[in-house]
């Protein structure tokens, strides 16, 4: 046995070890060709990505700057492959905010992919040995991974910032509608939130649905707001929401029908408690009335134990009037008492007698010295004029409060 047979066989170095020992000559070549690599990478984007040509000149320049910075950072990173991704992150810190808004995340991924594919094709040509080729290949793969994650982080941060800004703008729009501030800024802000400014608007008010554990945190309220938006989107509607105190105020486009599936799905975002719907406004700038009536209804709905869910604010006129809601008092006067007064004193007299007799037609007829059929005819006429049937308990209550309000001479606008 000779001495050569006893000599240990040299272990080949791993790719990571090769990456740690890149010769200075290779690093100098990388730096020398960095400008050319960046320019040709942008040219590759123009050839392989159809959307790139549609970007404005300033946006293409921003992309070129990012690529140039990424190439320079790659050269610096190759000096110390164990360093963090700070060099890589610097490339995306240069991206203007308007560019992150105009270029979708998928397009950014495509640009990163094309750039790194180009690097994989060209950079290895700078190698002068198999070891250098391996080191460059491993370096590109590791660097491209960091670059991809950083791109995703940049867009996630931008999306989060936009989401926060959109939430604040949405809250300001809802607050403006509630306060009746219908200045020109209202429509511009709503339009920025993809609201059709010519669409009718209906306001709902209720308590946001609690969390899975029955909690009522800010996060649960935001989840309920998002549920309203998602439900509206599924049904081809738009929605603006905000939490005012303990109530969730939602403005949805279009009218709401009690039998509509959209309304049923919408109620899932609210707690199992009263939900009040205001009247539909012709457009967003006129939605203050819908909001004020819905909020007034929420304040008064406890007065009607059997109130349906949801309940129209207009069905809560008696309770709202008893709480001093001027608009409810006006509605009772204009929709109930004025039509009866215009028809002559007979119908009001019959209504008072019928209600005083506890809804007994025979007793009412005796009190008025008329035939019971005359009372029935007059009650039908009252229904025709007011839309309220005195023989139905809830309508009778509405008519009673309306008559009381009329007798108390509440001031009403002319």
Swiss-Prot record:
Basic and acidic residues bias (residue ranges): 220-230
GO terms for biological process, alphabetical: positive regulation of DNA-templated transcription
InterPro entries, per the entry: CdaR-like_regulators (IPR051448), CdaR_GGDEF (IPR041522), PucR_C-HTH_dom (IPR025736), PucR_C-HTH_sf (IPR042070)
GO molecular function terms listed in the Swiss-Prot or TrEMBL record: DNA-binding transcription factor activity
Segments of this protein annotated with the region Disordered: 204-230
Record Pfam families: GGDEF_2, HTH_30
Homology family: Belongs to the CdaR family.
Name this protein carries in UniProt: Uncharacterized protein Rv2242
Organism of origin: Mycobacterium tuberculosis (strain ATCC 25618 / H37Rv)
